[in-house]
Amino acid sequence: MRLLEMRGLTWYVACIQISARHAGTMGMNMKTSVAIEKAIPVADPDVVRAEFRNAMARMAAAVNIVTTNGPAGLAGFAATAVCSVTDSPPTLLVCLNRSASVHPAVTENGVLCVNVLSEGHQDLSRLFGGKTPVAERFAAAAWSELSTGSPALEDALVSFDCRIVRRADGGTHDILMCEVDAIRQRDGGQGLVYFDRNYHPAGQAE
């Protein structure tokens, strides 16, 4: 068996000797060499990750700021990996990188608030998505509290105040199941989505 590397593909080539009895009148033995080639793609993990990120950049997603406060401290981060799970009971799913500086505060506090951003919140999203100190992040906007004590952005389109009821392993991330305790909405305004590595307003359909 030979192993050949060709442009990122691994090729296994097997040469098999097959004995076959000739069915003709002479009754001769024949040995036939058969080469079987099979192409087995072996993905480069770095290439796959890069392609996945590029593909996910084409999936538009709402931009949110997720906050927490409690015994483990005040923290907040920008997130697009947020979605609805069910309305019975009302539950959101939030994905949080375990290497993120906010991870200990969020998981130890056990509460969070998902604040859905509007088109005017691009700068605020950048603050919460970078390495800006916590105090400076929160000083850039007005906040209040709903039921859990997590900061609720005053001019968010919607604020979902939640308790973390379950946590699952998702590779590099924790998958947080968050049961909603309180909701605050405001009328008007356009949403903010992240698409193709840039911010875009998301208005109501005409």
Swiss-Prot record:
Its EC number is 1.5.1.42. Belongs to the non-flavoprotein flavin reductase family. RutF subfamily. One of its GO terms (biological process) is uracil catabolic process. HAMAP family: RutF. It is an enzyme of class 1 (oxidoreductase). One of its GO terms (molecular function) is FMN reductase (NADH) activity. It catalyses: FMNH2 + NAD(+) = FMN + NADH + 2 H(+). It comes from Rhizobium rhizogenes (strain K84 / ATCC BAA-868). This is FMN reductase (NADH) RutF 1. NCBIfam families: RutF. The keyword S-adenosyl-L-methionine does not apply. Keywords: Flavoprotein, FMN, NAD, Oxidoreductase. SMART domains: Flavin_Reduct (SM00903). InterPro entries: Flavin_Rdtase-like_dom, NADH-dep_flavin_reductase, RutF, Split_barrel_FMN-bd. Catalyzes the reduction of FMN to FMNH2 which is used to reduce pyrimidine by RutA via the Rut pathway. It comes from the Bacteria.
